[in-house]
Amino acid sequence: MSKMTVEVVTPERVVYSGQAEMVIARGLQGEIGIMPNHMPLVTPLKTAPVRIKTEGDKEVKMAVSGGFMEVRGDKVTILAETAELPGDIDVERAKAARERAEKRLTEKYAELDVKRAERALQRAMARLDVSK
């Protein structure tokens, strides 16, 4: 199967750079799968796991918080606010963050920033999904 170059970049570092057969990410309209020779595309990404299929059934998963994905020729670039590989994730901290966000959303504080609590919950859920 043909391959494409994939890079996942944050403001701090290059999180992943390598060859892949497919990239699966969550855009605003749902999951999108990119394979070699895909038409050019730029799309915003939601906070969610990104899966990079490297060869056969091997896969690299990471938790990505926001950003954009650009597809040009045989290159996919993900520019993300944050991107964490499973080994970078503190599972206990992610569980605590999920619990805090869920508590905030159910208790309805008067000055609650609902969008912020929802984003925190999405980040925690993505981290926990990737760390499995």
From Swiss-Prot:
It comes from the Bacteria. Keywords: ATP synthesis, Cell membrane, CF(1), Hydrogen ion transport, Ion transport, Membrane, Transport. The keyword Cell membrane applies. It is found in: Cell membrane. Its main location: membrane. F-type ATPases have 2 components, CF(1) - the catalytic core - and CF(0) - the membrane proton channel. CF(1) has five subunits: alpha(3), beta(3), gamma(1), delta(1), epsilon(1). CF(0) has three main subunits: a, b and c. NCBIfam families: ATP_synt_epsi (TIGR01216), PRK00571.1-3 (NF001846), PRK13442.1 (NF009977), PRK13446.1 (NF009980). This is ATP synthase epsilon chain. It comes from Brevibacillus brevis (strain 47 / JCM 6285 / NBRC 100599). The gene is atpC.
